[in-house]
Swiss-Prot record:
Keyword terms of this UniProt record: Ribonucleoprotein, Ribosomal protein
Record bears the keyword Ribonucleoprotein: yes
Keyword set includes Metal-binding: no
PANTHER family associated with the record: RIBOSOMAL PROTEIN S9, SMALL RIBOSOMAL SUBUNIT PROTEIN US9M
Cellular component GO terms held in the UniProt record: cytosolic small ribosomal subunit
The family this protein is said to belong to: Belongs to the universal ribosomal protein uS9 family.
The protein's name: Small ribosomal subunit protein uS9
Length: 130
């Protein structure tokens, strides 16, 4: 691919995204599909666009993204994290603004495991007094 592109890896829950950005017209391609085709939910599309909208760079970059693992929400979060990292590689002076918005920090929350003797991670079986 082109030499003038920047790369960022993003992760969220069990999803990981590889994001390549290069100067362009604002075209976003995720796993060979457009943003609208890939994410049916408007909330997921909004999450993906957040870093670009924050910096007023929506129409300035073309994004080529590959994402795998997890569900819709996790993938959207991973893409957002990847875009943020790629933008910081492009221009380090953007870090402060992105950090203030909370996009730089990796969201470390994971699904809590199910425990033996419980129905779910914390849900206990119904208690019967008699």
């Amino acid at each position: 691919m082109a030499e003038n592109q920047n790369y960022g890896t993003g992760r969220r829950k069990s999803s990981s995204a590889r994001v390549f950005i290069k100067p362009g017209s604002g075209n976003i391609v995720i796993n060979q599909r457009s943003l609208e085709q890939y994410f049916g939910r408007e909330t997921a599309r909004m999450v993906v666009r957040q870093p670009l909208e924050l910096l007023d760079m929506v129409g300035k970059f073309d994004l080529y993204i590959t994402v795998k693992g997890g569900g819709i929400s996790g993938q959207a979060g991973a893409i957002r994290h990847g875009i943020t990292r790629a933008l910081m590689e492009y221009d380090e002076s953007l870090r402060g603004e992105l950090r203030k918005a909370g996009f730089v920090t990796r969201d470390a929350r994971q699904v809590e495991r199910k425990k033996v003797g419980l129905r779910k991670a914390r849900r206990r079986p119904q208690f019967s007094k008699r």
